[in-house]
């Protein structure tokens, strides 16, 4: 087993104003490919091209009357582009009372009485029809949709009303003000389909369905449009869209990307979680039976599936293979196109004993492509059976939490219970097994879920994993056997169907969709008793990555330092996987707090709740949290939501289901992660939202930031951050006269790690420090001069490009040497001042950054190009020696070989951020930072031939162009104190 990284293990911490900061376990992120031609990808966490498009322009402002009405009812309002409420959030009291106990009648009465607040004309209000009514405990979420002269709204036009006992607690909408009949279509459905095909860059075989709908447009009448569902044929990346084509002028109004980047009693042999994570070939599968019977280790049938999993709903007979009402599983070895669905089901078993052989062949034969032609066929039957069983289990578990026919779930037959049918989960096992891999590594090291609108069958692709030079060092394993990955991908289907109704899907770079999928996966495993103990219970992808700590993420959510000031923290930029980790950490805290209030129960109670046998009001805290998550999905009628929107929906779900019993707990947990009552986001794409650490249910501590220099004098221009990141993070206090931020910040009680920075002062870590309720704390932070700072007068010379950026006190920029051997590459810093200094400490950052157009180093920065080991040399200039020659410098320090540690599958942000190193007391006017290795050339886990695939070499130093690139963000130097 590979050893998980610890971000500060084995390295001296930075200058500390209080206790030395020990950071939580490090973790995964994504491989960069800045100069490797034809490289693979994207892998989990990589930047992915945004393919959504909305060509509708204009924005209607809410009227003064609307704003006044919102204030009158005590609602916190956010407005959409139509000038109607995107969110009306209760601030304590209901938004309306005295309504009918019938949810639909209450919602309709609310609309009728609040047209002035909602901004609707009489015709706009009358055009609403009920889409679904989803129970939330004793309340419900009522989803209404506008009709425009007989045409249902295809995109937007939705209103979600959360009601309980005749009171409205939450409103979300994408309503148009009016609902007049659009001008009649002049294009045919076929013409619209051709336009959508051309716009998406796919062929005509991609068209899955065409329907005439209405699409509202801000400040204009709604347009008749054709909704065209496309499933494409691009082998390099999944391509699928719902495209709305104007039915009169042929323009593409909206294009939405559908892809998210993970006998009578039948029995299945399955891995409930994963095969052994020591990668032995011990078969630890258990026998699941649909009904009780001899030899069954677990009974899995529940009322969520009226038919046994392998019964064909068209003839009510057993399929005797991996096909049933909820899902089917096939192999798709011969196509890298994620939108194709294989044809070959598992080998039939007339006795319905799906106990196929598993030999661990892909791992034992080290990713050899010869496995596909062997008698064992790479354990494909076992893979199909495992994937099929896991999809059925997710169907049943989520059904008991509210993902049912009326909330647009995945079933071939809906048994006349509502919703559209003919859409079971289509599972491709070992997708692209034969055609994928080297040289492009298509169909490797990933998984995806494609979720079209209700009534169109979704597709999920599970891939094989293998090491890829300079990119992603996975073990040779099959993703069909890692339930955290399978459940994660199924989670995308859940949220894309439940949030914003059956058509709109879910789109936000702030990453809640990725986070929700992670959270659903860990909760499923926990409730069923399949999760490992300790922090590994919160790892996504341990088996497919060999990292028991963080898996495919940057952090294990149970030990994450992230908060809402860190949305853009990762060097891939604002990206759903990394940004979503903020939401995961927040929800982990909420889950733990609810367990603290309601207990964890025992294994029997957890399983009973998971199977829907025990009502949630009698379940442990974690099940209550899971239920609130599902309830919150139904309260969001907008697909493009921010974390603040999602926070408000979760708070409203608690008001509706539990009568607000947990508002204090929820608010305090949100505030601890920067999503407190003052948090704000400028839309769903805001990379720099406003954090708030204040709660309406807490007596906050007041922290006053007071940085001082060596003489005890105040430091101007300093910034204070909550957590370990400066680059692309948002400060919570500062001493800059030109900003409105101020020196004091209110924070809920708790323990915090902080970071201070200032021009000419470098980085100072603070804490952990405990802040008590109601305390007033003056945080005096010593900030000595960074002798290697350009702001203090230092200058840099040497190899490479962007030399000034290694001495700018800013981890958001970096120096690079590109395209030549890296060992010995150096930057020499002429230290601040005219005299020699006694230097006893340096601080170095290997942090990378997103692409910057026009920069000398403009592109994506490969992860393994980050510095790993370095040396420090010194020179003290004299009248006879100006430190101009290499011979003038003496070696004073060699860092540990893993100064910036990373392990498989790849480097990630926590391992690369700034850290401190004590060096011998050195008299110097000049210091030289010299590269020994980067991550590619120096990390043992990226070295050597790691598989038996003859088509590619896995050794990073010889097979990746990143071996010739190296980057450093900061070099800082401090005098002996």
Short names for language-model regions:
Residues 30-41, 65-68, 78, 207-209, ...:
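Extracellular zinc-dependent metalloprotease catalytic-domain scaffold
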Residues 759-784, 939:
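Structured interaction patches on ligand/partner-binding surfaces of diverse proteins
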Residues 702-710, 781:
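A short, amphipathic beta-strand motif
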Residues 709-733:
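Short, ordered, surface-exposed loop/turn motifs in non-cytosolic proteins
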Residues 2-30:
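Secretory targeting and sorting signals
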Residues 25-190, 194-200:
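Preferential activation on post-signal-peptide N-terminal prodomains/segments
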Residues 748-760:
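A short, solvent-exposed beta-strand micro-motif common in secreted/extracellular proteins
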Residues 810-887, 908-977:
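Aromatic, loop-rich ligand-recognition surfaces of beta-strand-rich domains
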């Amino acid at each position: 087993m590979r050893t998980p990284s610890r971000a500060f293990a084995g390295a001296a911490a930075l200058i500390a104003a209080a206790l030395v900061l020990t950071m939580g376990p490090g973790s995964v992120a994504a491989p960069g490919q800045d100069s490797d031609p034809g490289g693979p990808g994207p892998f989990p966490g990589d930047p992915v091209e945004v393919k959504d498009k909305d060509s509708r322009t204009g924005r209607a402002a809410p009227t003064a009357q609307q704003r006044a009405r919102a204030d009158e009812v005590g609602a916190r309002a956010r407005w959409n582009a139509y000038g109607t409420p995107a969110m009306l959030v209760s601030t304590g009291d209901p938004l309306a009372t005295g309504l009918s106990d019938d949810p639909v009648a209450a919602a309709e009465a609310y609309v009728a009485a609040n047209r002035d607040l909602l901004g609707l004309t009489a015709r706009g209000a009358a055009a609403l029809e009920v889409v679904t009514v989803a129970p939330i405990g004793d309340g419900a979420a009522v989803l209404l949709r506008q009709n425009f002269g007989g045409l249902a709204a295809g995109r937007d036009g939705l209103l979600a009303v959360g009601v309980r006992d005749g009171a409205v607690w939450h409103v979300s909408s994408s309503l148009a003000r009016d609902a007049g009949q659009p001008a009649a279509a002049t294009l045919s459905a076929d013409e619209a389909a051709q336009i959508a095909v051309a716009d998406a860059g796919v062929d005509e075989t991609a068209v899955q369905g065409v329907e005439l709908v209405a699409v509202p447009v801000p400040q204009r009448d709604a347009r008749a449009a054709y909704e065209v569902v496309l499933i494409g044929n691009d082998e390099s990346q999944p391509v699928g869209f719902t495209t709305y084509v104007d039915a009169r002028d042929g323009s593409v109004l909206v294009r939405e990307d559908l892809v998210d980047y993970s006998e009578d009693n039948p029995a299945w042999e399955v891995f409930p979680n994963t095969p052994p994570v020591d990668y032995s070939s011990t078969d630890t599968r258990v026998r699941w039976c649909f009904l009780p019977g001899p030899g069954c280790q677990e009974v899995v049938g529940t009322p969520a599936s009226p038919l046994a999993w392998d019964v064909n709903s068209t003839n009510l007979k057993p399929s005797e293979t991996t096909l049933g009402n909820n899902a089917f599983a096939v192999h798709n070895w011969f196509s890298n196109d994620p939108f194709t669905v294989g044809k070959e089901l598992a080998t039939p078993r007339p006795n319905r004993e799906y106990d196929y052989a598993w030999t661990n062949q892909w791992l034992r034969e080290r990713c050899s492509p010869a496995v596909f032609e062997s008698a064992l066929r790479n354990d494909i039957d076992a893979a199909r059976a495992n994937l099929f069983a896991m999809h059925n289990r997710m169907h049943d578990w989520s059904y008991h939490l509210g993902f049912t026919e009326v909330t647009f779930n995945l079933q071939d037959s809906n048994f006349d219970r509502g919703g559209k049918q003919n859409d079971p989960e289509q599972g491709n096992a070992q997708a692209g097994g034969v055609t994928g891999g080297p040289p492009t590594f298509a169909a490797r090291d990933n998984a995806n879920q494609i979720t079209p609108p209700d009534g169109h069958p979704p597709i999920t692709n599970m891939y094989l994993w293998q090491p890829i030079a300079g990119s992603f060092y996975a073990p040779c394993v099959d993703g069909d056997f890692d339930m955290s990955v399978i459940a994660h991908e199924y989670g995308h289907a859940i949220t894309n169907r439940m949030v914003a109704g059956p058509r709109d899907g879910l789109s936000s770079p702030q990453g809640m969709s990725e986070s929700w999928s992670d959270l659903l996966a860990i909760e499923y495993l926990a409730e069923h008793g399949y999760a490992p103990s300790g922090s590994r219970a919160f790892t996504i992808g341990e088996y497919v990555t060999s990292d028991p700590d963080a898996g495919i993420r940057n952090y294990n959510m149970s030990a994450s330092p992230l908060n809402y000031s860190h949305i853009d923290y990762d060097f891939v930029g604002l990206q759903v996987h990394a940004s979503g980790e903020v939401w995961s950490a927040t929800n982990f805290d909420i889950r733990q707090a609810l367990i603290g209030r309601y207990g964890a129960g025992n294994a029997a109670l957890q399983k009973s709740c998971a199977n829907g046998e025990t009502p949630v009001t009698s379940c442990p805290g974690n099940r209550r949290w899971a239920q609130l998550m599902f309830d919150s999905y139904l309260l969001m009628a907008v697909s493009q939501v921010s974390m603040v929107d999602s926070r408000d929906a979760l708070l409203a779900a608690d008001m509706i289901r539990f009568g607000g019993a947990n508002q204090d707990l929820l608010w305090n947990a949100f505030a601890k992660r920067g999503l407190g009552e003052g948090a704000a986001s400028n839309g769903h794409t805001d990379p720099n939202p406003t954090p708030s650490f204040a709660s309406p249910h807490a007596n906050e501590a007041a922290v006053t930031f007071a940085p001082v220099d060596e003489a005890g004098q105040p430091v101007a221009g300093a910034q204070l951050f909550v957590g370990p990141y400066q680059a692309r993070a948002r400060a919570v206090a500062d001493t800059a006269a030109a900003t409105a931020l101020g020196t004091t910040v209110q924070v809920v009680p708790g323990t915090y790690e902080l970071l201070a920075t200032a021009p000419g002062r470098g980085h100072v870590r603070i804490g952990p420090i405990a802040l008590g309720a109601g305390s007033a704390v003056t945080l005096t932070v010593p900030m000595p001069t960074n002798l290697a700072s350009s702001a203090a007068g230092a200058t840099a010379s040497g190899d490479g490009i962007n030399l000034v950026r290694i001495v700018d006190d800013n981890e958001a920029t970096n120096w690079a040497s590109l395209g030549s051997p890296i060992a010995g590459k150096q930057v020499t810093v002429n230290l601040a001042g005219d005299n020699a200094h006694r230097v006893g400490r340096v601080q170095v950052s290997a942090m990378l950054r997103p692409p910057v157009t026009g920069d000398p180093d403009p592109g994506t920065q490969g992860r393994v190009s980050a510095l790993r080991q370095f040396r420090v040399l010194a020179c003290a200039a004299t009248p006879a020696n100006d430190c101009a020659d290499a011979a003038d410098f003496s070696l004073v320090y060699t860092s540990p070989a893993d100064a910036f540690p990373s392990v498989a599958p790849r480097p990630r942000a926590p391992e690369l951020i700034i850290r401190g190193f004590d060096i011998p007391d050195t008299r110097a006017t000049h210091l030289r930072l010299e590269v020994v290795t980067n991550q590619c050339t120096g990390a043992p886990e990226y070295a050597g031939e790691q598989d038996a695939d003859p088509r590619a070499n896995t050794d990073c130093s010889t097979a990746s162009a990143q071996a010739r690139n190296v980057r450093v963000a900061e070099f800082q130097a401090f005098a002996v104190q």
